[in-house]
Amino acid sequence: MVDFILNAQVRSDLGKGASRRLRRNAGLVPAVVYGGDKEPQSVTLELREIAKLLENEAAFSHVIALNVGGAKETVLIKALQRHPAKGFVMHADFLRVVADHKLTAHVPLHFINEEVAVGVKQAGGEISHTISEVEVSCLPKDLPEFIEVDMAKVELGQIVHLSDLKAPKGVELVQLAHGNDLAVANIHASRVVKEEGSEEGAAE
């Protein structure tokens, strides 16, 4: 599953000073590619190109074809370092992907049917999201773009846990496999309802 392409060049000028010069003078981003029983490789990316790639949420959970000076690597985005104020990418880590080796990656959660959830539509509750992504383990070909959380039947006061999610075939939720059935979302009483109740109690 390779839907994204990114171009890079081998980087030989290493160190913090060299990285700063790249970003300041050439509009380039230093990065490293590692894993897959190969030596880590330092590369540079065009800031504009990686910024455009990251506009698509799916890029974070898809295998990327990284062209490094004519050689192709299949990778996942493993980590990004961003400027604390301006938000642009300052450094990127890519993990090599091997077709027959399981990988771990963070996949976003997509919450659906929130407006028709029992606890919202019938009881006037509000939905709170505890987490927005999950770590999964699977073969590269099975890596999902996202995992859906169907809120339609969730009632007021009910908590949705990892064990309630339907992971695609071949996909394992890492935290759940380790015995951590994390809370994902819940429906609680609306603040407006709580405030109105408090005011009525005070009036009595």
From Swiss-Prot:
Superkingdom classification of source: Bacteria
SUPFAM superfamilies found in the cross-reference section: Ribosomal protein L25-like
Keyword tags: Ribonucleoprotein, Ribosomal protein, RNA-binding, rRNA-binding
Molecular functions per Gene Ontology: 5S rRNA binding; structural constituent of ribosome
GO biological process per UniProt: translation
Entry keyword annotation includes Cell wall biogenesis/degradation: no
Pfam family, one: Ribosomal_L25p
CC terms in the record's Gene Ontology section: cytosolic large ribosomal subunit
CDD domains hit by this protein: Ribosomal_L25_TL5_CTC
Gene3D superfamilies, sorted: Ribosomal protein L25, beta domain (2.170.120.20), Ribosomal Protein L25, Chain P (2.40.240.10)
Quaternary organization: Part of the 50S ribosomal subunit; part of the 5S rRNA/L5/L18/L25 subcomplex. Contacts the 5S rRNA. Binds to the 5S rRNA independently of L5 and L18.
Family to which this protein belongs: Belongs to the bacterial ribosomal protein bL25 family. CTC subfamily.
Functional summary from the UniProt entry: This is one of the proteins that binds to the 5S RNA in the ribosome where it forms part of the central protuberance.
Protein name: Large ribosomal subunit protein bL25
